[in-house]
Amino acid sequence: MTAAVAEPRIVPRQTWIGLTLAGMIVAGWAVLHVYGVYFHRRGTLTLEIAPAIVAVQTRMSVGHKNVAHDAMHGSLAPGRPRLNAAVGRLTLGLYAGFRFDRLTTAHPAHHAAPGTADDPDFHAPVPRAVLPWFLNFFRTYFGWREMAVLTALVLIALFGLGARPANLLTFWAAPALLSAL
């Protein structure tokens, strides 16, 4: 006699907790992003405030990746694949214009062979060097479509919404890049 395989139990509380935490990360990131990019002005407190904002934004950017990772595994909102995909798309899009579907397709290969030449998230030729890994990661996941989306967002921020270039680099680009390390 074979034992029946039980279906995973969908836990509404887990979904609520996951979505609440994801919402807090996205909202916190958005508030700091809007302040830093559009309202922060150089002044007497810049040296004290700007590094703190960059540090928190960097952590929030890591949070975007963590939320997307949970969404890829379906653990953000168990039993709700479309909701997981929607939240994953939002967080990766805000993070750096990455396509959730592209990363989700390659992600199982990472778990199948972590830290090996077959791991798309690992740079086997020079495993301890950050720059070659970083460039390899971007070549793997950041294509022309992502570049077009990111370029459009930057142009809208600069010319449509009046963001200062230094603020965009400091409070959006720098935290996103730092969070990848």
Residue spans for each PLM region:
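Hydrophobic transmembrane alpha-helical segments that form the core helix bundle
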Residues: 51-58, 114-181
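Alpha-helical transmembrane segments of multipass membrane proteins
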Residues: 28-32, 57-65, 178-179
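Membrane-interface helix-boundary motifs at transmembrane edges
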Residues: 42-45, 74-83
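Alpha-helical transmembrane segments of integral membrane proteins
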Residues: 16-24, 48-53, 84, 166-170
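Membrane-proximal soluble regions of multi-pass membrane proteins
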Residues: 78-133
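Active-site recognition of the HExxH zinc-binding catalytic motif
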Residues: 66-73, 77, 110-111
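Membrane-embedded alpha-helical segments that form the functional core of polytopic membrane enzymes
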Residues: 43-64, 90-98
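Topogenic membrane-insertion module of multi-pass membrane proteins
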Residues: 1-47
